[in-house]
């Protein structure tokens, strides 16, 4: 092969790499679920920022679906350019509606709920196996915490003792009535979608998660992890988000 041909080949490779880089979405917004706050995303945040992404973490009030959508929308309004929207657990219901925001180019569900239009969160569990280790204690005011004694096994069985204790003690209670609020329009009908499903999740039946992800047309990654997959398998979660960022603009529905 001549030097000129090698030079042209090198230029083509460089052009292809530059084109791929231009199509990679930089903005990522992370949305936590119930019984948690945004601090649990720290390991995913660190990995994504190291890959050059601009990451913003929503702090949901967990007072209603509408309030959580509003909190997420405020963050999306701040993004400059296309954005990958990521939700864990209840955060999946939030991104299903908030994902209709024009800035959102792709969705990533991390062991997350994905209701269809007109459905609420509570109905997603119908017909699937119960999760006896996921125990919610509901107060007189209608807000629920995860039970202190069963938290580790139900939410973070594969986390070390320190991380499990931190997650337990950093809980944010959710207004249980939020689970009865239906989604108006499921954004996954219109946006390319990815899903990470934790196969050892004691909070959700994996069959339920798979059903929702397949219905949404998601590209699914299975990983051996608890419901705290965002913390215990941060490498896998961040890589799926990065792949979504690379591909969302070229796989738009």
List where the protein language model places each region.
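Short, proline-enriched alpha-helix->beta-strand connector loops that line the catalytic pocket
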Residues: 26, 188-193, 215-218
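Short beta-strand/loop motif that positions the catalytic acidic residue
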Residues: 195-197
